Amino acid sequence: MSRAHTSRAIAKDLLRASKLPLLPRDESHVEADLKRIHKGKTLSPVLLVRGDLSQGIPLIIADGYHRICAICYFDEDSPVAFRMAALRR
C-alpha cells in the first residue's frame, strides 16, 4: 500500500459502495474524528480494497470506516482521501 497513489472520493459514495451502515455519531472513534475535523486537522487516508460487482463483492474498507462515517456526519459530500488495493483471488 505504500506505493499506492492517494486519490479522493465522496464520503457517501464510499459508504454506499461498501454496503456498510453509517456508524452512530456517538461511537467513540467517530466522535474523536469529528472533533479533529472541527479543529481543522487532516485525517489520514482510508485504506480500501477494490470490490468486484460482477461477483457481488462490495468495496472493502480495510482501515478508516470510522473516518468515513465522521466525514459523512460533517458533510456527506466531502471528499475522502484514500488508497486503493486490488482484490486478490
How should each PLM-predicted stretch be described?
Residues 79-85:
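Short hydrophobic/aromatic-enriched beta-strand-loop microsegments
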Residues 1-60, 73:
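Short alpha-helix boundary/capping and kink motifs at helix termini
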Residues 49-51, 64, 85:
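Short, loop-centered acidic/histidine patches that primarily coordinate divalent metals
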Residues 58, 65-79:
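Short active-site loop/helix that positions an aromatic residue
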Residues 87-89:
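Amphipathic, charge-rich alpha-helical segments that serve as recognition/docking helices
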